[in-house]
UniProtKB/Swiss-Prot annotation:
GO terms for molecular function: sodium channel inhibitor activity; toxin activity. This is U17-barytoxin-Tl1c. The keyword Ligase does not apply. The lineage of its organism: Eukaryota, Metazoa, Ecdysozoa, Arthropoda, Chelicerata. Keywords: Cleavage on pair of basic residues, Disulfide bond, Ion channel impairing toxin, Knottin, Secreted, Signal, Toxin. Its main location: secreted. GO terms for cellular component: extracellular region. Ion channel inhibitor. Residues 21-74 form a propeptide. Expressed by the venom gland. The keyword Secreted applies. Residues 1-20 form the signal peptide. The presence of a 'disulfide through disulfide knot' structurally defines this protein as a knottin.
Length: 115
């Protein structure tokens, strides 16, 4: 209980005397407001405006590209059933497998034979 009282009293003292540098803070605020209207600040603001414009143009370009369905459609991998409605990937071909016809009821995506 005594430690809590000590910490609470320290907290009260810190909040009471913590803003002893209020005059310094007022000077810093005044300097900041004066610096806002310097040429460097205006140049920096112009650069930020340019960056925002470029980001808006980039966003518009990517929206148009996404609207054109420019991405390749998903396709199946190797050893996966395929058919007329389900295509294989570019380098694979849809072939009917041999052996166990009761097991393999549809053609599968396989690597084309080189022979």
């Amino acid at each position: 209980m005594k430690t809590i009282i000590v910490f609470l009293s320290l907290l009260v003292l810190a909040t009471k005397f913590g803003d002893a540098k209020e005059g310094v803070n007022q000077k810093q605020k005044k300097e900041v407001t004066q610096n806002e209207f310097r040429e460097e600040y205006l140049n920096e603001m112009a650069a930020m405006s340019l960056v925002q414009q470029l980001e808006a143009i980039e966003r518009a370009l990517f929206e148009n590209e996404a609207g054109r369905n420019s991405r390749q459609k998903r396709c199946l991998g190797e050893n996966v059933p395929c058919g007329d409605n389900i295509p294989c990937c570019g380098k694979l071909s849809c072939e009917k497998t041999f052996g166990y016809p009761w097991w393999y009821k549809s053609p599968y995506c396989v690597k084309p034979s080189s022979g």
